[in-house]
Amino acid sequence: MNKVIILQGLPGSGKSTWAKQYCKENPDAFILNRDSLRKMLNNGEWSAKTEEFVKAIELSALEIILKGTDNATVLIDDTNLNLKTVNNLLKVCNSLEADVALKDFFHVPLHECIERDSKREKPVGSSAIIRMNEELIKFKSYISKL
């Protein structure tokens, strides 16, 4: 049975590092990442204009992988702090009967995420990470009520 691991956390929390290590240990695993798709479509720049395309391509790629394999593991290596985004991923997974696991990186302190991000070639920026942290607080509050 196929398995999808949805990574969740702020930029700089270690999601991509974890995903790369997972793939070293599990060479048949796939990583889907919207940042990588943005690089192909828009030179890595985020824009509202292309973001819907990026999300649609990621969902389509997930569907293609799940339909084309029997025992794949797919890592969704994005922040995944938006409930609508997570629900869209879950719909694809459920429709194709894939096992789903959430792997969160919520334990990484905000200041550490900001520091790690500042060392990147293309940093997201502290104001964006702080804004995403506010989304994360809302997300965790919603999840705790389930």
What are these regions (language model features)?
Residues 1-4, 8, 13-16, 21, ...:
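Conserved GTP-binding G-domain of TRAFAC-class P-loop NTPases and closely related GTPase folds
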Residues 2-6, 30, 71-75:
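Residue-level preference for the first positions of well-ordered beta-strands
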Residues 13-72, 111-115:
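Conserved substrate/cofactor phosphate-moiety recognition/catalytic segment
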Residues 29-31, 100-103:
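Conserved beta-strand scaffold positions in the cores of enzyme catalytic domains, especially
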Residues 35, 102-109:
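A short, structured active-site edge motif that brings together acidic residues
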Residues 51-59, 83, 107, 126-133:
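Amphipathic alpha-helical transducer elements in NTP-driven molecular machines
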Residues 73-78, 102:
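Short catalytic-loop micro-motif centered on adjacent basic/acidic residues
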Residues 76-89:
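Acidic, metal-coordinating catalytic cores used for nucleic-acid/nucleotide bond scission
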